[in-house]
Amino acid sequence: EMGVRVDPDNAVIHVDGMRLELRSDVEHLALNKPRGVHSTMSDDRGRPCVGDYVADRAQRLFHVGRLDADTEGLLLLTNDGDLAHRLMHPSYRVLKTYLAEVPGPVPRSLGRTLRAGVHFDDGPVAVDGFRVVQAMPGKALVEVVLHEGRKHIVRRLLAEVGHPVLRLVRTAIADVRLGEQRPGTVRVLSRPEVGALNRAVGR
C-alpha cells in the first residue's frame, strides 16, 4: 500500500513473493575460496584464512558453514545471523553442489549406490544427486549434490565407495552458483540470489 511507513530494521517486506532486505547494513557475499585457505575469520598461526578477503569491510561478517582447507569454491559470508543459522541447520535441507575429481573409471552403478545411502558409524548418508560430468584417462569429474552438512562428508562418501577425492570444489549453495567467479575474489550477491536463499529456508 502506497504511503505506508515501515521500520527498516524490523519490517519484513515481500514483493511478488521475494523478500526485500531493507536494512542498509546487511551484507551477503560470495567468496571463491582458494585451496589452502582456512574457513576462519582469523588465524593465530598466521595461515591464510577467509577473514583476509573481507578485512577491509566495515561490517562484522561470518562465514556460513565451512570448507576444509583443501576444498575450493563457494563460501557465503554475511552479517545476517538468522539467515546464516537457517542455511546451516539440517532441518532446512539446503542443497550444496560439488565437483570432485576422482580416480576412474566410475561405474554407472555408483549413482544408485550413493542415492541409496552409505552407512557410517555416525549414521547413513545419501546424496540428492550424482552424475559423471567428464570421463578422462584414469580419472573422472563427478558432480555430487547433497543437503548433508557433516564434516568432510563428500570426501568420506567417495572414499567409502572406492573413489577418493583428488580435488574438490563447491559450485553452488541452493540457487547461488559459483559460475565464472575467479578464485580469491569476493562479490556481493544479487537481490534474486538473496531472495533464492530466503526461499530455500522459508523466509
Task: Name each region found by the language model.
Residues 1-203:
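Basic, flexible Lys/Arg- and Gly-enriched helix-loop patches that mediate nucleic-acid binding at interfaces
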